[in-house]
From Swiss-Prot:
Taxonomic path: Bacteria, Pseudomonadati, Pseudomonadota, Betaproteobacteria, Burkholderiales
Family: Belongs to the transferase hexapeptide repeat family. LpxA subfamily.
Catalysed conversion reaction: a (3R)-hydroxyacyl-[ACP] + UDP-N-acetyl-alpha-D-glucosamine = a UDP-3-O-[(3R)-3-hydroxyacyl]-N-acetyl-alpha-D-glucosamine + holo-[ACP]
Gene: lpxA
Gene3D superfamilies: Hexapeptide repeat proteins, Udp N-acetylglucosamine O-acyltransferase, C-terminal domain
Matching InterPro entries: Acetyltransf_C, Acetyltransf_C_sf, Hexapep, Lipid_A_LpxA, Trimer_LpxA-like_sf
Alphabetical GO biological process terms: lipid A biosynthetic process
Protein name (database record): Acyl-[acyl-carrier-protein]--UDP-N-acetylglucosamine O-acyltransferase
Main function: Involved in the biosynthesis of lipid A, a phosphorylated glycolipid that anchors the lipopolysaccharide to the outer membrane of the cell.
Length: 262
């Protein structure tokens, strides 16, 4: 029995593993590659130079690999890469990259992408990310591992959001959010650290307390940012168990091109 519905249109040049399921009325373009165990629901369009890994589930009416919503795009063969075990719900749109960046949009593995999410051109997403309904990423946004974006969160182009960071419902993000930090509001401002998420991921009480001290140095000490970075380094040198996380926080701030939320 074929796993491709009789009404689906799969280009003969597309490369689909024999275990891939394709639902009714879906369209798969000629430059698409889909690995074993992935399920493409009904009424899905997968186009462009798109590679989809193993055991992904894509629900109805998603648009995967369409041209960037960028007027500079002139049809170049840019790419979209999707890893393994992702869930992509209804009406999600994920666009190809552009030649103005790295030529590729990337989605890692084990991500949960809820309905109506938009992931624009050249976005780079890590692993174990949750994007709640209607979250919108503008072009060139980078999300590190374990990020959680609340529903209707919007992220300005070129912003970075650090590992384990979280946004509240309707947050409007216009600057970088450091790792572990929770942000809320329009414009988004810091609102503590993502303690509950860290507990669920096995961080110890001592590590969470050290991260909280790092947060207070940045956001509650009234120190200029350069002095806060020096104080973070001193805290890092005192906290052997949490030093990698404090270093992660400090390095993110030092390399932030847009500046962090304050």
């Amino acid at each position: 029995m074929s796993l491709i519905h009789s009404t689906a249109i799969v280009d003969p040049k597309a490369q689909l593993d024999t275990s891939v399921e394709v639902g009714a009325y879906s369209v798969i373009g000629p430059h698409v590659k889909i690995d074993a165990g992935s399920k493409i629901g009904p009424h899905v369009v997968v186009e462009g130079h798109t590679t989809i890994g193993r055991d992904n589930t894509i629900f109805q009416f998603a648009s995967i690999g369409a041209a960037p919503q960028d007027k500079k795009y002139a049809g170049e063969p840019t790419q979209l890469s999707i890893g393994d075990r992702n869930t992509i719900r209804e009406f999600v749109t994920i666009n190809l990259g552009t030649t103005q960046d790295a030529n590729i949009t990337r989605l890692g593995s084990d991500n949960w992408i809820m309905a109506y999410v938009h992931i624009a051109h050249d976005c780079q997403l890590g692993d174990n990310i949750i994007l709640a309904n209607n979250a919108t990423l503008a072009g060139h946004v980078h999300l590190e591992d374990w990020v959680f974006l609340g529903g209707f969160t919007s992220v300005h182009q070129f912003c970075r959001i650090g590992a384990h960071a979280m946004t509240a419902f309707t947050a409007a993000v216009s600057q970088d959010i450091p790792p572990f930090v929770t942000a809320a509001g329009n414009r988004a401002v810091p609102a503590g650290i993502n303690s509950e998420g860290l507990k669920r991921r096995g961080f110890s009480s001592e590590q969470i307390m050290a991260i909280k001290r790092g947060y207070k140095i940045i956001y509650r000490s009234n120190l200029p940012l350069e002095e806060a970075k020096a104080a973070l380094l001193a805290e890092e040198n005192k906290s052997s168990d949490a030093a990698p996380y404090l270093r992660q926080l400090r390095t993110f701030i030092e390399t932030s091109p847009r500046g962090i939320i304050r």
